[in-house]
């Protein structure tokens, strides 16, 4: 799809990973900006918006589709723009594959939701997955777990997954109080006492601990 696009739209980092020589691009990630471009360039018949992660899990795709639909409704031309979502490799499946942990029993939560919901998920599940929007989110997450007496938990933080600079750091939550890595990171929390009745296959808790060096690509 990217190779056949008349124009590629997305954040600079995303465009850099897929653009081919001579291909037209437009750097933008806000739904309104992307929609404005689409509607103001009717000559571009095949526009591809490149987003990271899974389009069904707290993705920018959700708001973008809603913004385009709203614009179509207001324009009175419902067929002016046709949309299609093409999923790639999701962040959760990528991180879990690297850790050799199946994610069928993992609880998926938003770090930007209510703190009580996140803590409940960690307490009641062996594994909890969330996405972060900044390094500060990772530090805050570690502190929140410690303050909630969940300091026995371990974390795996994956940054730039599937990219050349991919890095996965593993360790006890205490080790992430000073995290200063990539802003866009995926976090998998392992609670050795969570979800005692759940059957989860994969790495043992002791294998989840980082040790002397980070796990990298």
Locate the predicted segments by residue:
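Class I S-adenosyl-L-methionine
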Residues: 1-85, 93, 210
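Short, glycine-/small-residue-rich phosphate/pyrophosphate-handling segment
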Residues: 2, 91-124, 133
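Short hydrophobic/aromatic-enriched beta-strand-loop microsegments
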Residues: 24-30, 76, 83-84, 103-110, ...
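Short amphipathic alpha-helix with an adjacent loop that forms part of the alpha/beta core around
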Residues: 35-42, 117-123, 175-178
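A contiguous loop/helix-start segment that scaffolds small-molecule binding in enzyme catalytic cores
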Residues: 46-47, 125-216
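Active-site glycine-centered loops adjacent to acidic/histidine catalytic or metal-binding residues
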Residues: 88
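Structural motif
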Residues: 10-13, 29, 52-54, 112, ...
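A short acidic, often aromatic-flanked loop/helix-cap motif at beta-alpha or helix-coil junctions
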Residues: 31-36, 91, 114-116, 162-165, ...
